[in-house]
Amino acid sequence: MSNPCGAVHQPLRRTILPSTKEMILLTNPETGYEKAHQQVEQIFREVFPARGMAVREGQIRLCHTMLDALFGRDVALCDAGVGLGKTYAYLVACVLWQLQKPRPMQRPVVISTASITLQNAILEEYIPFLSKVLIQNGYIQDPICAVLRKGKERFVCDVRL
């Protein structure tokens, strides 16, 4: 089955993930972990405010926490109030994390939401805006590719998760 991004989707399967030490070795040594965290600061303190967005310390901390979890192959359970900017925090973390991996190592990031409204907003507002801003500021060259997967076979099962 193909999608608009041109990738072929295979059924989910369990794989053995590299350890944190191995993961750090797989990252691009020129840009790596530290640069990704520096880019979080630049994006949220300079790039977004230049577009009229407010600097939110909680949003920046949340993005750093999520980036740490992604680099460490850990789980981050984060709770944040309405209006903090959670969506941009996790989208920026995911984009920066993917940028640190060589192309063959990049895999899709799965985001599960509680509402159809948020799904639509991510696809129609957040990702197009983020793509445009990150391209204009030299962080990425191509637009962020996203696909919405619907249907009962796509639901996250609490028991199997």
Predicted regions and their residues:
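Low-complexity, intrinsically disordered or signal/transmembrane-proximal segments
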Residues: 9-10
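A substrate-engagement module of RecA-like helicase motors
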Residues: 16-45, 49, 54-57, 101-161
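N-terminal pre-P-loop "Q-motif" helix
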Residues: 53-70
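Walker A/P-loop
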Residues: 72-92
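Walker A/P-loop NTP-binding motif
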Residues: 67-68, 88-104, 127-129
